[in-house]
Swiss-Prot record:
Taxonomic source organism: Drosophila yakuba (Fruit fly)
Function comment: Mitochondrial GTPase that mediates the disassembly of ribosomes from messenger RNA at the termination of mitochondrial protein biosynthesis. Not involved in the GTP-dependent ribosomal translocation step during translation elongation.
Protein name: Ribosome-releasing factor 2, mitochondrial
Family to which this protein belongs: Belongs to the TRAFAC class translation factor GTPase superfamily. Classic translation factor GTPase family. EF-G/EF-2 subfamily.
Biological process, per Gene Ontology: mitochondrial translation; ribosome disassembly
Protein localization: Mitochondrion
Tagged with keyword Ligase: no
GO cellular component assignments: mitochondrion
Matches recorded under InterPro entries: EF-G-like_DII (IPR053905), EFG2 (IPR030851), EFG_II (IPR041095), EFG_III (IPR009022), EFG_III/V (IPR035647), EFG_V (IPR035649), EFG_V-like (IPR000640), G_TR_CS (IPR031157)
Length: 712
């Protein structure tokens, strides 16, 4: 039977749902739908931009402001208190006869998994830059995520009203740091009163926004002959020349035209659309969301240049008459239960429709909602290409291993790249009676956030959380209190060290036991070696090959699982063992021996090998960008040197500031934000993100072991 797929986002295994009822399938894509994500570095103005879109589209009656805590998309208590986006949220609004489904995503590195989930559902993205800062650390991260999903994108350079904004530097950053080909459709200009206006390259108009009506209206005036017009005409000619090298239709017109001035605007826009959807160029627009400038033209550009659903996802035509879509996020609502956010790829979903997952679990869609952050408007049906919230799908999301997927799953799966946890800590309920409620809360939070790791430490008997940073862990604790009314205690934050073997080792382990009257016997020879590629391999040397050829594929899979499971917890601090390969030399399995016994023996053999070879610790390293006034740099660098930091570069940042690029061990950065504020008297800013692991010297290793044992 052909399996229609509902594909989940990261760590929420790939799910494909198909319609069981006998219906005639009609392709109902609308060319008027745009599914977009909005991405940015923290504080670039992404949420403010989204709030302006909702306001000008008529979905809200007042302007939402981050600093006032009244935004639509930042609806969690923690988001409004801190002024940052934590969870991605979906909103739907009309604009110029189009329907835009927008996913607002977090900008903080601790919540990058939310970005990854959202990109499963969109056809294009808007990347917001801070006009005073250009391309920043998290901009590079989200750009690479969009690259992985092959998403067309627009650039919106925000905060161009600021005196220190530098549009040319932002464009240069796009070329140098993101290695993309930007095409500037607008340039900033200040009116006589000093207010930001925009010169449009294609239409040769000046756009000025009226602030008396909060930017709802703007006037566009053709530029009179002047230096500004001549410069803009040159920019228009450069744009046409650039696009004609990428688009045959425009090139044919240019060849037959005497002057670039006679090239029709509509022809330029069509060529720009084709080049954008084919990811040959990235259109660049500008404005100031906070000052209500440029937002309507940004929404026009979304409609004009980003693809409709029918222009992507042609691969899913193979499902024929089946209904298919992607499940990209799960949220929990106290009144409605689990809500499933779905991007519909084919067909139409209706309320009451019966669906079945590729794993054979039947579901019934009890209700459908149009998304507006945490507000929901019920609808009866949703067509292909759209985004919808489904209630009633209680078992669609489960945590299954990748190796359980069959070929059809692998064909349509996207590697989620769930980042490794960099911190972990114990979590305890306030009382024994709250244990079950806490476990249920963690289960629901894990469904929403795949980067949250929950495990049980059999040695200490504690529940252990793993997360992306101090802020991530703090938000989890706060959400458990505010949403589930459980005041949990978090233990001290511990660094998520990794381990790697010091030297190769080879051993044989033979185990015989009688369990429930059945004899269980396994003899296995394994070796551990340094290797960054495969975690498990077969030693197909002449002396071992005859034995390996007698082992059934199922037994090899069991041996592989057992061996790899032992690498999850190293002998020194319980860190994951990496850069290590297990080689199977030979194995003898007694008749009637259970798979679980074989798996346990393999794990025990690997643990013995790790103890024999010995392990070294690897500590997580963070890449920091610190911006501070020049006179504060020496004090900051002196403090960094005491933290075992490696200073890579010091660059000028504007007229008065400098930027320090540095790598430092995470273990030395606890509370560093507060320390930096003290050293710089509050004048410095910092961004930080993981950049890999590094080996440690013996003194630092001993200190790390003592910290892991709670002795420091």
């Amino acid at each position: 039977m052909l399996r229609c797929a509902w594909q989940n986002g990261p760590r929420q295994s790939n799910r494909w749902l198909r319609h069981l009822s006998n219906q005639i399938w009609k392709r109902s894509y609308s060319s008027k739908i745009r599914n977009i994500g909005i991405l940015a570095h923290i504080d670039a103005g992404k949420t403010t931009t989204t709030e302006r879109m909702l306001f000008y589209a008529g979905k809200t009656r007042a302007l939402g402001e981050v600093h006032r805590g009244n935004t639509v998309t930042d609806y969690l208590t923690q988001e409004r208190e801190r002024g940052i986006t934590i969870c991605s949220s979906a909103v739907t609004f009309p604009w110029n006869d189009h329907r835009i489904n927008l996913l607002d995503t977090p900008g903080h590195i601790d919540f990058t998994m939310e970005v990854e989930q959202s990109l499963f559902a969109v056809d294009g993205v808007v990347v917001v830059l801070d006009g005073t800062a250009g391309v920043e650390a998290q901009t590079v991260t989200v750009w690479s995520q969009a690259d992985k999903h092959k998403l067309p994108r627009l650039i919106f350079v925000n905060k161009m009203d600021r005196p220190d904004a530098d549009f040319d530097k932002c464009v240069a950053d796009l070329k140098d740091k993101l290695e993309t080909q930007p095409v500037c459709l607008q340039y900033p200009v200040k009116n006589e009163d000093g207010v930001l206006a925009i010169n449009d390259v294609i239409t040769l108009e000046r756009l000025s926004w009226h602030q008396k009506d909060l930017g709802r209206s703007y006037k566009n005036v053709k530029l009179e002959p002047s230096d500004d017009l001549r410069q803009l005409q040159e920019k228009r000619s450069e744009l046409i020349d650039q696009l004609s090298g990428l688009d045959d239709e425009l090139a044919d017109v240019v060849i037959s035209t005497e002057s670039f001035d006679k090239v029709d605007n509509a022809l330029i826009e069509r060529a720009l659309r084709r080049a954008t959807t084919q990811q040959k160029v990235v259109p660049v627009l500008l404005g100031s969301a906070y000052k209500n400038v440029g937002i309507q033209r940004l929404m026009d550009a979304v409609n004009s240049y980003l693809p409709a659903p029918e222009e992507r996802n042609q691969i899913y035509d193979c499902f024929g008459t089946e209904v298919a879509g992607k499940v990209f996020k799960i949220v929990h609502d106290k009144q409605r239960g689990p809500l499933t956010l779905i991007r519909i790829l084919r067909g139409e979903i209706k309320r009451g429709m019966r669906l079945i997952s590729a794993r054979g679990q039947a579901e019934v869609v009890s209700k459908l909602y149009e998304p507006l952050a945490d507000e929901y408007r019920e609808v009866s049906a949703v067509q292909s290409g759209d985004v919808v919230i489904c209630a009633g799908l209680k078992s669609t999301v489960t945590d299954e291993e990748d190796d359980e997927l069959d070929e059809s799953d692998e064909l349509f799966a996207i590697d989620p790249q769930i980042p490794d946890a960099v911190y972990f800590c114990s979590i305890e309920p306030p009382s024994v009676s709250s244990q079950t409620a806490m476990e249920q809360a963690l289960k629901q939070l894990q469904r929403e956030d795949p980067s949250l790791r929950v495990s049980y430490d059999s040695v200490t008997g504690q529940t252990v959380l793993g997360g992306m940073g101090e802020l991530h862990m703090d938000i989890i604790k706060s959400r458990i209190l505010s949403e589930y009314k459980i005041d949990v205690d978090l233990g001290p934050l511990q660094i998520a060290y990794k381990e790697t073997i010091e030297s190769p080792a080879l051993t044989t382990l033979s185990v015989e036991k009688e369990i429930a009257g059945s004899k269980q016997s396994v003899s296995i020879t394994l070796e551990v070696v340094k290797n960054q590629a495969e975690m498990f391999s077969l030693d197909k040397s002449p002396e071992n090959l005859p034995n390996l050829n007698t082992l059934r594929p199922r037994i090899l899979q069991v041996l592989r699982k057992g061996s790899i499971s032992a690498l999850e917890r190293g002998p020194r601090v319980g860190g994951q063992v990496v850069e290590t390969q297990i080689r199977l030399h030979n194995a003898t399995i007694g008749r009637g021996t259970a798979d679980s016994f074989v798996m346990a023996t393999a794990a025990q053999c690997v643990q013995k090998l790790l103890s024999t070879s010995g392990t070294r610790l690897l500590e997580p390293i963070m890449a920091l960008q610190i911006v501070a006034p020049s006179e504060r740099i020496s004090g900051i660098m002196a403090d960094l040197s005491r933290r075992r930091a490696l200073i890579n570069d010091v660059l000028p940042k504007g007229e008065r500031n400098k930027m320090i690029l540095v790598n430092a061990p995470l273990a030395e950065l606890s509370g560093y934000s507060s320390a930096l504020r003290t050293i710089s008297s509050g004048t410095a800013s910092m961004t930080m993100q993981p950049c890999g692991f590094s080996s440690m010297n013996s003194v630092d290793e001993s200190l790390a072991e003592r910290r892991a044992q709670g002795l420091e």
